[in-house]
Amino acid sequence: MEEKTKTVPFYKLFSFSDSTDVLLMIVGSIGAIGNGVGFPLMTLLFGDLIDSIGQNQSNKDIVEIVSKVCLKFVYLGLGTLGAAFLQVACWMITGERQAARIRSLYLKTILRQDIGFFDVETSTGEVVGRMSGDTVLILEAMGEKVGKFIQLIATFVGGFVLAFVKGWLLTLVMLVSIPLLAIAGAAMPIIVTRASSREQAAYAKASTVVEQTLGSIRTVASFTGEKQAMKSYREFINLAYRASVKQGFSMGLGLGVVFFVFFCSYALAIWFGGEMILKKGYTGGEVVNVMVTVVASSMSLGQTTPCLTAFAAGKAAAYKMFETIERKPSIDAFDLNGKVLEDIRGEIELRDVCFSYPARPMEEVFGGFSLLIPSGATAALVGESGSGKSSVISLIERFYDPSSGSVLIDGVNLKEFQLKWIRGKIGLVSQEPVLFSSSIMENIGYGKENATVEEIQAAAKLANAANFIDKLPRGLETLVGEHGTQLSGGQKQRIAIARAILKDPRILLLDEATSALDAESERVVQEALDRVMMSRTTVIVAHRLSTVRNADMIAVIHRGKIVEEGSHSELLKDHEGAYAQLIRLQKIKKEPKRLESSNELRDRSINRGSSRNIRTRVHDDDSVSVLGLLGRQENTEISREQSRNVSITRIAALNKPETTILILGTLLGAVNGTIFPIFGILFAKVIEAFFKPPHDMKRDSRFWSMIFVLLGVASLIVYPMHTYLFAVAGGRLIQRIRVMCFEKVVHMEVGWFDDPENSSGTIGSRLSADAALIKTLVGDSLSLSVKNAAAAVSGLIIAFTASWKLAVIILVMIPLIGINGYLQIKFIKGFTADAKAKYEEASQVANDAVGSIRTVASFCAEEKVMEMYKKRCEDTIKSGIKQGLISGVGFGISFFVLYSVYASCFYVGARLVKAGRTNFNDVFQVFLALTMTAIGISQASSFAPDSSKAKGAAASIFGIIDGKSMIDSRDESGLVLENVKGDIELCHISFTYQTRPDVQIFRDLCFAIRAGQTVALVGESGSGKSTVISLLQRFYDPDSGHITLDRVELKKLQLKWVRQQMGLVGQEPVLFNDTIRSNIAYGKGGDEASEAEIIAAAELANAHGFISSIQQGYDTVVGERGIQLSGGQKQRVAIARAIVKEPKILLLDEATSALDAESERVVQDALDRVMVNRTTVVVAHRLSTIKNADVIAVVKNGVIVEKGTHETLINIEGGVYASLVQLHISASS
């Protein structure tokens, strides 16, 4: 049993209403009651009408008598108009207002939570999901649905009061049918919802497969994992198909039962009503009045289910949100209590600190850690990855509080300060700069409230960012994209530094702050930082010792303890000391060449933001990326237009295998459509029978009640069969389309994904939303049109045979009744359905803020985020209110029109009867046949899908299906070599990325790699080193020239086989949200790797040790993108994955860059063992990795300018390699 869903009591939903809301709710409720009572009053008038026509058929004054009743209809219509308007408008407006208030309160509360809350209790996805999804559910539960509920209950109560007054005995007999009607009406939505949530759950899992696969498409392609992805995708899609068929069948069954009970209740009433007319002296009109009122009132009770479902969903959604809103954080960003001093000197002390992260309370980071940093000093923290260096920074920022011990600034416990004030004195620049989806100016402006443009420009200048910003077409106004994807890593880092400079803090915290820069920018930024660090207390966390050297004090941290402390020169004296060992690990012989990590880390960061986004990956070229984008957008617009027109026949063709099912379904649909018009004739016959002489009446009423039972039985059979058949046809179509699309996408060439239009999110939503819309185009629309056509034809035939004159007059007004029926159902379903889309933009603000909560916290930008959020919401609230008013007017008018049409019809009928052109029975037959037809059609149509959207969806889906993959991994043709030696040659290669055709990466690149050699590629960031690796794996094909493997051109070899010969370890290891075991086994293509092979690979990659030390060992789930492991651990799992593959050619793209010196040494040893007898291509900055390569090739301006061994190249006077090395030596010292 799953635990019971927690909910809040219904009245609590309204706990955030103000006096205006209370007034709106009261007025809205009064309107709803008035509107609800309108229907029973209408049946009362209908009964009077029947009597006045039935009893005065031969009377000269029939027109006068009838017109009096008709006038009452018009008055009733006017009254209902006002009531309905107040009901809808007031409830929609108050719902919109209160939901907006809850939404911003929730965001505000989220922003004030301590960081631990985000580690343990929530995620960006959850927050955004709640803000866009859950608040819509809450809005539905407290808006128009409440009005609707009050209206339906008023109809129910009013109807029964009236029925008892008019004929209590008949009413009592009919009460038998109420529970059945109400139960049938209520059970259907529950069963349907259950099936639909199963379907949604299966689809959600399928979407995760899509997101994971496309988000790491390079890894999937490199390890030929397309088949695995397809397999798991198919499994989930099949589950969803089964659920959707169940849903279709249960919906049909529900409807069938409802109509069966409905017709049987009429049968009972007709038989018993006849008895009442004979024995108790009822009139025909009274019997009809009671019949219609009781059935309609009972139905109205059944119609409350959508409201009750909405209330339940809203109460459940509110529980989590309100719980968060009421949560008091242990570290509260909005708490203004606490000390505020004139200024601080900046002395920092950690005293006996014990600390573990909330997400891993059992693993202690510090147990009694102490550290003192004098004010104005620069302190550096060094140590291996995972030793606790960044934790010190988090504690100083008070992201967390220690479990015992204290953190002091100027001798005052951090907890005693006002949090906002003390954070305002601390500036943080971290390793992965976090930018918000807004302009560069706004991003820098986060550093200081109300900063002027001059101040922002000065800060940018100081951070060495002004140059590249000026080159951008829109300068400071340039939008940086989500997470800053439009900029390279180095550019993002400089903006982050400018943001910290603008803040002018007393304490500066630099967490690997220059790691993302290449040597040149690093030198300049380091100078900027040196200027900024003057007379401030600075804490530096770094791998790279060049940054650390000049620090006043260096603390070496090992497993949460300080093992050594002192200045660079002091610590070097102890040769066996931890610091000296770290230095030794980083040095090669006597050269302190940190060439390595500067670029190394820089590229890692560039890539970190967007492993999918080639644009940032390759180039630090500033304006090109933006211009390239603009040029490309125009092209895509054109291609989009062309794909817009997709004929329905083409979609229908996909449904061809289900032809028989569709034909059967269509026939049943036709039968289904005639049920309502037949009901109209039967009802007219019944009314006629009630005014016959007693003997005939008794016989007729029995006969017609039997016919009604048969009609009920027909409904019970036809409805479920009809919906089941269409559910099967539609479900199979969706299944087919989704699988076709995903298969196509997975096998597209990697370059296709560089286009932002083909990002994993976009494709994911196209697969889910568009496929669902297409189903509506074929299955649902077809079933609907058949049903409606049958209803229309049968209704017209019946009406015209009865009295063509009256039929023509009523036909003119029928569209109005149809519109009314349509609006009524729309209202039951809710006008708020499209509220979700409106909040997308505002959600992005929340998404950004929560995703980078540490940045928001450290810059005290909570208020700023709230302002931005509220600004984006203003229009939404206005449009919500406008929508409320419009819906209210529409809803009110529709009632008025309906009642006026009724009045006109009977008035005209009475005149025709008086003139002797028709008789009383025919008037009712025409009226009921046509109105029932209209109601049937409009009810069906209101569930009609939006076909215009579906056409767009079809175009988008066929756009994918028709796409041609330039490099298709399904292509089985091509040679397979028996024995691979591993000779590689690149001949005259020219290459540009499609997304940036104006940036030439290679011009005539020539280069040979002999079998078994280790070749290192070096060059500055953006020179195209990683591109070589992409070309070798055929992620791209060169524009001209060719690449050969063992003298055979790559294009002639079977693609899948080629990729199986190569093992890639990239700079950012991409792991899947699965166990460590299955991540390693992925290298073998999933299932084939044995336990022994997996462990052997892990041992070789120096990963077995840390895997065994984790509680679940190889069964540990690594989390989304491997988030549960540290960088070094992820990298080792990735290396193990490549080893399991036993590749002939090894491609290492910055494979050890993410590791600290200690792990790097061990992994490097592992790689050295793996590289034996394999052709290896290494891209790296670190000389330790490059030095022992057989050949070093220096790439510059798209060609190879130097190649040879380390010894040869270093001795070339003024050579590129020598100057690269020199640059880094000077950067280090």
Curated annotation (Swiss-Prot):
InterPro entries: AAA+_ATPase, ABC1_TM_dom, ABC1_TM_sf, ABC_transporter-like_ATP-bd, ABC_transporter-like_CS, P-loop_NTPase, Type_1_exporter. Residues 348-584, 984-1222 form the ABC transporter domain. ATP 1 binds at G383, E384, S385, G386, S387, G388, K389, S390. CDD domains: ABC_6TM_Pgp_ABCB1_D1_like, ABC_6TM_Pgp_ABCB1_D2_like, ABC_MTABC3_MDL1_MDL2. ATP 2 binds at G1019, E1020, S1021, G1022, S1023, G1024, K1025, S1026. Gene3D superfamilies: ABC transporter type 1, transmembrane domain, P-loop containing nucleotide triphosphate hydrolases. This is ABC transporter B family member 3. It comes from Arabidopsis thaliana. It is found in: Membrane. Glycans are attached at N56, N450, N645, N758, N1073, N1173. It is a multi-pass membrane protein. PROSITE patterns: ABC_TM1F, ABC_TRANSPORTER_1, ABC_TRANSPORTER_2. One of its GO terms (molecular function) is ATPase-coupled transmembrane transporter activity. GO terms for cellular component: membrane. Keywords: ATP-binding, Glycoprotein, Membrane, Nucleotide-binding, Repeat, Transmembrane, Transmembrane helix, Transport. The chain crosses the membrane at residues 22-42, 73-93, 149-169, 172-192, 252-272, 281-301, 661-681, 706-726, 797-817, 888-908, 923-943.
